[in-house]
Amino acid sequence: MLGFLFKKVFGSKNDRYIKRLRPIVAAINALEPQMQSLRDEDFPVRIAEYRQQVEEGRKLDDMLPEVFALVREAGKRVFNMRHFDVQLVGGMALHHGKIAEMKTGEGKTLVATLPVVLNALTGKGVHVVTVNDYLAKRDAAWMGQLYNFLGLSVGVIVHGLDDEQRKAAYGADITYGTNNEFGFDYLRDNMKFYAEQLVQRGHNFAIVDEVDSILIDEARTPLIISGASEESTGLYRHMDEIVRKLTRDTHFTVDEKARTAMLTDEGVAFCEKLVGIDNLYDPGNITTQHHLMQALKAHNLFRRDVDYIVKEGQVVIVDEFTGRLMPGRRFSDGLHQALEAKEAVKIEAENQTLASITFQNYFRMYAKLAGMTGTADTEAVEFHQIYSLEVVSIPTNKPMQRKDFADAIYRTKREKYDAIAQAIAELHKAGQPVLVGTISIETSELLSTMLKKTGVPHSVLNAKHHEKEAEIVALAGQRGHVTIATNMAGRGTDIVLGEGVRELGGLHILGTERHESRRIDNQLRGRSGRQGDPGSSRFYLSLEDDLMRLFGSERISGLMEKLGMEEGEPIEARMVSRAIENAQKRVEGHNFEIRKTLLDYDNVMNQQREVIYTLRRDAMSAPDLGPTMEEFLDDVLEDVYAPAEGGEAPSADTVAAVWGRLADVCNITRVMQPAPALPTRDEARAAVLSILHELREDTGESYRDIIRYFMLEELDRCWKEHLRNMDHLRDGIGLRGYGQRDPKLEYKREGFAMFQEMLFRIKEGVFRSLTRLRVQRVEEEAFRHKEQPAAVAYSGGEAEAGPAQPHREDPKVGRNDLCPCGSGRKYKKCCGA
């Protein structure tokens, strides 16, 4: 009650923020005559002057009115488009590092130019992040005209560019690109061997377009760079054959709400018999069990033409939020291979993670982050908790005129689709354009078939027909036009109403099913009623829809019975609509917890990732790695000598063991023969440094490159192995909950211990390699072409040719021979991994 009264008297927090910006808007408007008097050639000169002022210490906030007024005038001259006052407010919200919620058609692309130009004055670069390559190229070319008019440079990052092109794009004042490309470039930079090979130049300021899609919808999917592993693909086919013989509810159960499939006791016994093993859950059968469960999920939780399609003999993922195809992106953990076996297409080798990061942790690296979207308010809590971003609702330039009708709810899908087809036919006959939103390719094609039978001409826009996306969406507002679009395909392209359509009521949005997120529903509605245009929307639902069936059916079914529904008769009751909205809120809360849990686990990895990447950057850029090598050596010798320094005289066995480790790790027998007594730690240190000194004498100026090569080589090898071990730890850590232990704390504790061990293995590995080098002829170029990992998940990079390897003193070790380090493991599973 008190909160309501406070809001009534003082306005909401959002209202108070916008009110504070009004005097600045007035100041910008007051500068308009001054900017109108400038000649075209004066604009780049002004920008150069502002840049100089920033270098001299003037704050961006003090310059905001002048710069915004200059950009507004530039917009008028280049595009004949003047920024509205509400767009100035949106620009200020972005500059302040907030999320600007602006309705469809309010000109988000133009709004971004204001803070982009202001922040580009620092010379540290501004990144504008979009959801796909098409929008990145379109906006860079379109808004690039304005930036070039002002004397600012523009780059664009899209799939297929080489490192030189990427470096040039990042070197520009303003860089457009997709979230995937920015994230992968960061990971790839941290796999490079020379500082001059890096393409990114830091993370200063980013504006994320469609911020809800990128920071929330895609936050459950980490970016992963991977290389092929050695596992055979035959096992996937075998497990697929077994799963086809299982019977639901007898051999396994499926929980669609939790998206899990589990074997029953009878199913376990049946599978053990078919595979020919005694115990499926024996540690020795963990690989078989894993592939069996993935095959079970592939057959029972993933649907063709909903979660993926088969195109040109490949399984291609369909983005559940946008309906777009995601070529090059693969499900991890063997699931994609299980789907390939299910669809009887070629099975690609499973990949091993070489580098990964979540979008949450990538975007939190920016000194300042802002975002734009038409729908963010429903996720304001998550934006604040995860990213410390506030959502500001920007008023529309003209009042909203769209009418949102109550949901029409039917008992069965058949009744619902019949009603939809009839409604479309009536609207088409009246000449009112209709945009039909579906949540799967399957539904869009079913409706298309129904409309063909009734003779209603229409366009279909889904992942199978995405080539003409912009063209189809642009025509969607024409008189009598019917467009069926999967989810939010076509976001970013305005639907302009054709002649005479306003008089007919504008564009009508027809939703065929509620999405599990209210925000996605609001995005679909938001395609109508842009810039004060008339419009309308209605969702058609049935009790058989996934959301109703899984999350709200019992209560809603009870309401239906009380209201006495008959076949084919819809119900339009606010009570039912509220029950559906509550079901959506439950799903949103569930998904938020999933994303938060992912972040909690990735925060552990993020701390480790930062340490490793800092080590790599130091190794790449340090003019002299000598002090680092001495520090590594001290740590190694401290560990080697620990058994012999307990206070008492070491036994003969202890002395032999220490000599053995000195020989293995430091190759000390190259300059010192084993004796009954151990050398002091200082003597051992001097001996190892003498080996390195000899290497420096033999290699001259190439010494630093050789040290760096082996340091980065060992670091990458150990980090790759550590990522795999952390994946395995994460997979099994949930079981700790049964032992009354917090899985997250256990993961953090054990992960830290594993990380400490890995750091030590890096130090050992560097000395094991360097002390065995015998130089015949070392060319610096041999170290400048370090082989990059072959397969890049999501982005598909190609491998470069590898270098000629330096000659070693030891005889060549076969991959299946015992490792010479003395671990007792095969070379390919140990130092040769």
From Swiss-Prot:
<feature type="binding site">
    <location>
        <position position="830"/>
    </location>
    <ligand>
        <name>Zn(2+)</name>
    </ligand>
</feature>
<dbReference type="InterPro" id="IPR014001">
    <property type="entry name" value="Helicase_ATP-bd"/>
</dbReference>
<dbReference type="InterPro" id="IPR011130">
    <property type="entry name" value="SecA_preprotein_X-link_dom"/>
</dbReference>
<keyword id="KW-1003">Cell membrane</keyword>
<keyword id="KW-0997">Cell inner membrane</keyword>
<dbReference type="GO" id="GO:0005829">
    <property type="term" value="C:cytosol"/>
</dbReference>
<dbReference type="Pfam" id="PF21090">
    <property type="entry name" value="P-loop_SecA"/>
</dbReference>
<dbReference type="GO" id="GO:0017038">
    <property type="term" value="P:protein import"/>
</dbReference>
<keyword id="KW-0067">ATP-binding</keyword>
<dbReference type="InterPro" id="IPR036670">
    <property type="entry name" value="SecA_X-link_sf"/>
</dbReference>
<keyword id="KW-0963">Cytoplasm</keyword>
<dbReference type="GO" id="GO:0005524">
    <property type="term" value="F:ATP binding"/>
</dbReference>
<comment type="similarity">
    <text>Belongs to the SecA family.</text>
</comment>
<protein>
    <recommendedName>
        <fullName>Protein translocase subunit SecA</fullName>
        <ecNumber>7.4.2.8</ecNumber>
    </recommendedName>
</protein>
<dbReference type="InterPro" id="IPR001650">
    <property type="entry name" value="Helicase_C-like"/>
</dbReference>
<dbReference type="GO" id="GO:0006605">
    <property type="term" value="P:protein targeting"/>
</dbReference>
<comment type="function">
    <text>Part of the Sec protein translocase complex. Interacts with the SecYEG preprotein conducting channel. Has a central role in coupling the hydrolysis of ATP to the transfer of proteins into and across the cell membrane, serving as an ATP-driven molecular motor driving the stepwise translocation of polypeptide chains across the membrane.</text>
</comment>
<dbReference type="InterPro" id="IPR004027">
    <property type="entry name" value="SEC_C_motif"/>
</dbReference>
<keyword id="KW-0472">Membrane</keyword>
<dbReference type="InterPro" id="IPR011115">
    <property type="entry name" value="SecA_DEAD"/>
</dbReference>
<feature type="binding site">
    <location>
        <position position="819"/>
    </location>
    <ligand>
        <name>Zn(2+)</name>
    </ligand>
</feature>
<keyword id="KW-0813">Transport</keyword>
<keyword id="KW-0479">Metal-binding</keyword>
<keyword id="KW-0653">Protein transport</keyword>
<dbReference type="InterPro" id="IPR020937">
    <property type="entry name" value="SecA_CS"/>
</dbReference>
<feature type="binding site">
    <location>
        <begin position="105"/>
        <end position="109"/>
    </location>
    <ligand>
        <name>ATP</name>
    </ligand>
</feature>
<keyword id="KW-0547">Nucleotide-binding</keyword>
<feature type="binding site">
    <location>
        <position position="494"/>
    </location>
    <ligand>
        <name>ATP</name>
    </ligand>
</feature>
<dbReference type="InterPro" id="IPR027417">
    <property type="entry name" value="P-loop_NTPase"/>
</dbReference>
<dbReference type="GO" id="GO:0008564">
    <property type="term" value="F:protein-exporting ATPase activity"/>
</dbReference>
<dbReference type="Pfam" id="PF02810">
    <property type="entry name" value="SEC-C"/>
</dbReference>
<dbReference type="GO" id="GO:0046872">
    <property type="term" value="F:metal ion binding"/>
</dbReference>
<feature type="region of interest" description="Disordered">
    <location>
        <begin position="789"/>
        <end position="816"/>
    </location>
</feature>
<dbReference type="InterPro" id="IPR014018">
    <property type="entry name" value="SecA_motor_DEAD"/>
</dbReference>
<feature type="binding site">
    <location>
        <position position="831"/>
    </location>
    <ligand>
        <name>Zn(2+)</name>
    </ligand>
</feature>
<dbReference type="GO" id="GO:0005886">
    <property type="term" value="C:plasma membrane"/>
</dbReference>
<dbReference type="InterPro" id="IPR000185">
    <property type="entry name" value="SecA"/>
</dbReference>
<dbReference type="GO" id="GO:0031522">
    <property type="term" value="C:cell envelope Sec protein transport complex"/>
</dbReference>
<feature type="binding site">
    <location>
        <position position="821"/>
    </location>
    <ligand>
        <name>Zn(2+)</name>
    </ligand>
</feature>
<feature type="compositionally biased region" description="Basic and acidic residues">
    <location>
        <begin position="806"/>
        <end position="815"/>
    </location>
</feature>
<dbReference type="Pfam" id="PF07516">
    <property type="entry name" value="SecA_SW"/>
</dbReference>
<dbReference type="Pfam" id="PF01043">
    <property type="entry name" value="SecA_PP_bind"/>
</dbReference>
